[in-house]
């Protein structure tokens, strides 16, 4: 009667290693579920999908029930079928209850972890679907808007080009007629006469002591101050091919007018310099020819 409990003890001892290996495998499964590929999670959050991601997810979902089916028979410890005495049965049951409770607790924890993992995955999938729908709507709306905006811009520029072409055609005959008679305003004549007189004065009195360009710069500063006291004539803006090209390229007309005004002022200063320098050289040559003793 005594050797029978020893057999049951041997059966329990042989069952404990199999229980430990099953718990290790279960823990490994939980760890794999928790430590999913970080790159896949980031792709799900950001909304990027690889072409093979769907197949991988299906394979993972298929492998999960297979692993659970494999682990279920391994998780049940081996219990001896021979029942001899009530004491031995009670002993076997009492020996088995702790391992069964641990398995139940482990299964509950695994279910909680699975639900905790699946919830963010579902929310991320819903967010990805919403993002994809929003992106699809945006692209569908932006495509006709972009084409419509481009068509309007093209038509507006075409109309501007036609207007500028007509303006150029109308200005060409008037420019050809007015080439011989160029109108000079009073301030322009005053500037040219002043530059010529300054050149004579500099050659006669200041040439030996100062630079010939210092008085010219002083005269230009005086012209800048006296400009507002002279009546301003109406300046006709001449439309050229360059201004037409600038307008068609999208540059505002105000910027073009300002730049043209700046260039016209620079041209006026250059004209004054040419008159001043030519008059100075002419006077110098005349004085050298008629009076060599004159300094």
UniProtKB/Swiss-Prot annotation:
Q: Keywords, A to Z?
A: Disulfide bond, Endoplasmic reticulum, ER-Golgi transport, Membrane, Phosphoprotein, Transmembrane, Transmembrane helix, Transport
Topology term for the membrane: Multi-pass membrane protein
Provide the membrane-side ranges marked Lumenal in the record: 207-208, 288-295
Query: What ranges does the record list as Polar residues composition bias?
Result: 15-24
Tissue specificity note: In the central nervous system, expressed in astrocytes, microglia and neurons (at protein level).
Q: Which domain of life is it from?
A: Eukaryota
The record places the following residue ranges in the Cytoplasmic compartment, namely: 1-188, 228-268
Please report any disulfide bonds recorded for this protein chain, giving both cysteine positions: 207-283
Question: GO CC terms for this protein?
Answer: cytoplasm; endoplasmic reticulum; endoplasmic reticulum membrane; GET complex
Which segments show compositional bias classed as Basic and acidic residues? 127-138
What GO terms are given for molecular function?
A: cell adhesion molecule binding; ubiquitin protein ligase binding
| Start and end residues of each stretch annotated as Disordered | 1-73, 127-148
Subcellular location per UniProt equals: Endoplasmic reticulum membrane
Phosphoserine: which positions carry it? 53
Q: Where are the transmembrane segments?
A: 189-206, 209-227, 269-287
Q: Among the record's GO biological process terms, what is one?
A: negative regulation of protein ubiquitination
- What does this protein do, in the record's words? Required for the post-translational delivery of tail-anchored (TA) proteins to the endoplasmic reticulum. Together with GET1/WRB, acts as a membrane receptor for soluble GET3/TRC40, which recognizes and selectively binds the transmembrane domain of TA proteins in the cytosol. Required for the stability of GET1. Stimulates calcium signaling in T cells through its involvement in elevation of intracellular calcium. Essential for the survival of peripheral follicular B cells.
State how it assembles: Component of the Golgi to ER traffic (GET) complex, which is composed of GET1/WRB, CAMLG/GET2 and GET3/TRC40. Within the complex, GET1 and CAMLG form a heterotetramer which is stabilized by phosphatidylinositol binding and which binds to the GET3 homodimer. Interacts (via C-terminus) with GET1. Interacts (via N-terminus) with GET3. GET3 shows a higher affinity for CAMLG than for GET1. Interacts (via N-terminus) with TNFRSF13B/TACI (via C-terminus).
Name of the protein: Guided entry of tail-anchored proteins factor CAMLG
């Amino acid at each position: 009667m005594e050797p029978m409990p020893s057999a049951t003890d041997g059966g329990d001892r042989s069952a404990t290693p199999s229980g430990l290996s099953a718990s290790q495998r279960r823990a490994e499964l939980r760890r794999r579920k928790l430590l999913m590929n970080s790159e896949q999670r980031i792709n799900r959050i950001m909304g990027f999908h690889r072409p093979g991601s769907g197949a991988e997810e299906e394979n993972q979902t298929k492998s999960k029930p297979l692993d659970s089916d494999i682990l279920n028979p391994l998780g049940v410890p081996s219990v001896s079928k021979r029942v001899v005495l009530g004491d031995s049965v009670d002993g076997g049951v009492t020996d088995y209850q702790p391992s069964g409770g641990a398995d139940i607790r482990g299964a509950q924890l695994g279910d909680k972890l699975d639900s905790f993992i699946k919830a963010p995955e579902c929310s991320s999938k819903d967010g990805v679907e919403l993002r994809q729908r929003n992106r699809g709507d945006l692209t569908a709306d932006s495509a006709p808007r972009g084409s419509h905006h481009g068509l309007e811009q093209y038509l507006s520029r075409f109309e501007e080009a036609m207007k500028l072409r007509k303006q150029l055609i109308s200005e060409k005959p008037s420019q050809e007629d007015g080439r011989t008679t160029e109108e000079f305003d009073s301030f322009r004549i005053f500037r040219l006469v002043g530059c010529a007189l300054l050149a004579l004065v500099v050659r006669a009195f200041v040439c030996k002591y100062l630079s010939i360009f210092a008085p010219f710069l002083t005269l230009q500063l005086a012209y800048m101050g006296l400009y507002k006291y002279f009546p301003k004539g109406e300046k006709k803006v001449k439309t050229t091919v360059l201004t037409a090209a600038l307008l068609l390229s999208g540059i505002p007309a105000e910027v073009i007018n300002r730049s043209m005004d700046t260039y016209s002022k620079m041209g006026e200063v250059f004209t004054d310099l040419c008159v001043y320098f030519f008059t100075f050289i002419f006077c110098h040559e005349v004085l050298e020819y008629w009076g060599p003793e004159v300094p």
